[in-house]
C-alpha cells in the first residue's frame, strides 16, 4: 500500500503534530509575570486578539500564543487581493498545482509579515507584565512569538500533506474542542450545574449540530445528460446529476471573518480609543450591535468571495462541453456558464443567510432578552467544529476506499 493512502499512518502523523501544537501552548514566554497577566487577562489589550477561536483557553502568554492567526490573516489578504489583481487570480484558477504552490509561498511570506506586526503589537502592550522592560526583552519576546507562529504554520502544513484534513482548520478545531471540553467539565464539577439545565443545554447543542450538518451536507442536484445516454435506455433516468453544495464555502468564511473581526476590534479598542468619533458612534449604535452587523457583513463577503474561488463557472461549463455532457434545456457554452453562475449566486445567498443567522441569533437573544443560549461556546465555533469534523470523516472514507481499491487491484 502506498504510504499516502495509509489511514493509520496519516492519523498517527496528525495526532503527532497536534500534540506538538498543544504542547507549545503550555510553554510560557520568559521574562513575564504570568500570574499578573492571568489575573488581568479579561481586561488587558491583547486577550481578544489571542483568543479568536478558543475563548476558554488558559490565560497564559505562551510561545504559540499567536497560533495560526498570522496565516489566517495572510490568507484573508490574498483572497481580497485576488479579486483586485488578475495575476493573483490567475495563479489560483488557471495555473494548476504550480500556481497553487507559488500562491502558497506568497501566503507564507505574508504570514511572516503579519506575525512580525502582531508580535510587536502584543509586546508593546506587555510593559505592565514584564519583570525587566528593556530593548532586549522587546526583541527577544518578538522573536519568540514570530518563531512560534512560523512553527505552528509549519505544523499546519505537515498536517495538510502528511495527515488528514486541512492543517489550519484541524488546529482551530482542536483548540475549540479543547476549550469546550474544559468549559463543560468546569460547569459540571465546579459550578455544579443542574441536571435539567445541562440536559436543555445538551439538547440545544445536538439540535444545532443537526441543523448545521443538514445545511453543510445539503446539495442542489443539477440534472445532466451525456452523449452515451442518448443511445441508451437510461435517457430519462434521474440518476445522473451534478451535485452543488448549498453552503459551498463550508467553514472558511466563518474562520476568515472571525480573524478579521478580532483584528478590527483590537484596532478600534486600543488604536482609535482616544478619538471622539468612536464615542460618538457608540452613542448612536452600541459596539455590540455594530460588531454583530460587521461580523455578518464579513461572513457574507467572504462566503461570496470563497465560493467564486472554489467553483469556477467558466471551467465547469468547459469541462462539461469537452465531456459531451449537457444540462437539459440549456445550451452548451455561454448559456451553461450563465446557468451555473445564477445557480451558484442563489445557493451562496442562501448559504450566507444561514451562516449569518446562525451567528446572529444567539447573540441577538443574549443582547435583547439577556438569555445566554450558548454559554461558553460561540455558535460560530460550533459551526467550525462540525464543519471540520465532517471534512475529516469524508477524507478518512476516501483513504479507506483507496486502500480497498489497491487491495482489489493487487
UniProtKB/Swiss-Prot annotation:
Concerning PROSITE patterns, the annotation shows: SECY_1, SECY_2
The membrane topology of this protein is:
Multi-pass membrane protein
What induces the gene encoding this protein?
A: A monocistronic transcript.
Regions that span the bilayer = 61-81, 106-126, 135-155, 170-190, 195-215, 248-268, 289-309, 349-369, 373-393
Q: InterPro entries under this entry?
A: SecY, SecY/SEC61-alpha, SecY_CS, SecY_dom_sf
Q: Please list the coiled coil stretches.
A: none
User: Which biological process annotations from GO are given for this protein?
Assistant: intracellular protein transmembrane transport; protein targeting
Provide this UniProt record's keywords sorted from A to Z. Chloroplast, Membrane, Plastid, Protein transport, Thylakoid, Translocation, Transmembrane, Transmembrane helix, Transport
Identify the GO cellular component terms for this protein. Answer: chloroplast thylakoid membrane
Q: Where in the cell is it found?
A: Plastid, Chloroplast thylakoid membrane
Primary localization class, coarse: plastid
Any S-S bridges, and between which cysteines?
none
Which Gene3D superfamilies has this protein been placed in?
SecY subunit domain (1.10.3370.10)
| Taxonomic superkingdom | Eukaryota
Q: Which PANTHER family match?
A: SECY/SEC61-ALPHA FAMILY MEMBER (PTHR10906)
Q: Which NCBIfam families match?
A: 3a0501s007
Question: What does this protein's UniProt record list under function?
Answer: The central subunit of the protein translocation channel SecYE. Consists of two halves formed by TMs 1-5 and 6-10. These two domains form a lateral gate at the front which open onto the bilayer between TMs 2 and 7, and are clamped together by SecE at the back. The channel is closed by both a pore ring composed of hydrophobic SecY resides and a short helix (helix 2A) on the extracellular side of the membrane which forms a plug.
Q: How does it assemble?
A: Component of the plastid Sec protein translocase complex, which is composed of at least SecY and SecE.
User: Would you identify the family this protein belongs to, as annotated?
Assistant: Belongs to the SecY/SEC61-alpha family.
* The protein's name: Protein translocase subunit SecY
Q: Which organism is it from?
A: Cyanidium caldarium (Red alga)
Amino acid at each position: 500500500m502506498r504510504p499516502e493512502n495509509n489511514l493509520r499512518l496519516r492519523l498517527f502523523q496528525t495526532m503527532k503534530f497536534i500534540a506538538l501544537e498543544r504542547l507549545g501552548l503550555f510553554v510560557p514566554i520568559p521574562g513575564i509575570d504570568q500570574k499578573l497577566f492571568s489575573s488581568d487577562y479579561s481586561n488587558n489589550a491583547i486577550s481578544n486578539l489571542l483568543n479568536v477561536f478558543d475563548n476558554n483557553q488558559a490565560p497564559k502568554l505562551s510561545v504559540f500564543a499567536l497560533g495560526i492567526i498570522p496565516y489566517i490573516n495572510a490568507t484573508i489578504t490574498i483572497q481580497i487581493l485576488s479579486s483586485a489583481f488578475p495575476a493573483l487570480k490567475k495563479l489560483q484558477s488557471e495555473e494548476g498545482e504550480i500556481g497553487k504552490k507559488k500562491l502558497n509561498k506568497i501566503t507564507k511570506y505574508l504570514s511572516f509579515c503579519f506575525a512580525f506586526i502582531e508580535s510587536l503589537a502584543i509586546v508593546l502592550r506587555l510593559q505592565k507584565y514584564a519583570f525587566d522592560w528593556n530593548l532586549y526583552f522587546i526583541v527577544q519576546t518578538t522573536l519568540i512569538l514570530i518563531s512560534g507562529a512560523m512553527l505552528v504554520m509549519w505544523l499546519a502544513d505537515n498536517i495538510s500533506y502528511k495527515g488528514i484534513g486541512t492543517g489550519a482548520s484541524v488546529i482551530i478545531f482542536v483548540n475549540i474542542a479543547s476549550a469546550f471540553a474544559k468549559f463543560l467539565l468546569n460547569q459540571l464539577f465546579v459550578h455544579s450545574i443542574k441536571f435539567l439545565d445541562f440536559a436543555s443545554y445538551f439538547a440545544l447543542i445536538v439540535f444545532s449540530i443537526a441543523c448545521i450538518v443538514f445545511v453543510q451536507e445539503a446539495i442542489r442536484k443539477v440534472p445532466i445528460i451525456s452523449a452515451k445516454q442518448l443511445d441508451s435506455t437510461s435517457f430519462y433516468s434521474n440518476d445522473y446529476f451534478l451535485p452543488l453544495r448549498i453552503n459551498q464555502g463550508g467553514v472558511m468564511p466563518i474562520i476568515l471573518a472571525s480573524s478579521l473581526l478580532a483584528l478590527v476590534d483590537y484596532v478600534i479598542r486600543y488604536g482609535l480609543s482616544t478619538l471622539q468619533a468612536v464615542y460618538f458612534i457608540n452613542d448612536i449604535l452600541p459596539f455590540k450591535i455594530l460588531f454583530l452587523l460587521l461580523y455578518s457583513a464579513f461572513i457574507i463577503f467572504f462566503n461570496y468571495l470563497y465560493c467564486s474561488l472554489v467553483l469556477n463557472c467558466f471551467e465547469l461549463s468547459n469541462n462539461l462541453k469537452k465531456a459531451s455532457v449537457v444540462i437539459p434545456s440549456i445550451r452548451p457554452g455561454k448559456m451553461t456558464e450563465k446557468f451555473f453562475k445564477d445557480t451558484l449566486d442563489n445557493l451562496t445567498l442562501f448559504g450566507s443567510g444561514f451562516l449569518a443567522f446562525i451567528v446572529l441569533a444567539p447573540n441577538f437573544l443574549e443582547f435583547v432578552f439577556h438569555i445566554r443560549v450558548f454559554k461558553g461556546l460561540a455558535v460560530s465555533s460550533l459551526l467550525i467544529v462540525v464543519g471540520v469534523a465532517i471534512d475529516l470523516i469524508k477524507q478518512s472514507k476516501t483513504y479507506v476506499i483507496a486502500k480497498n481499491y489497491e487491495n482489489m487491484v493487487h
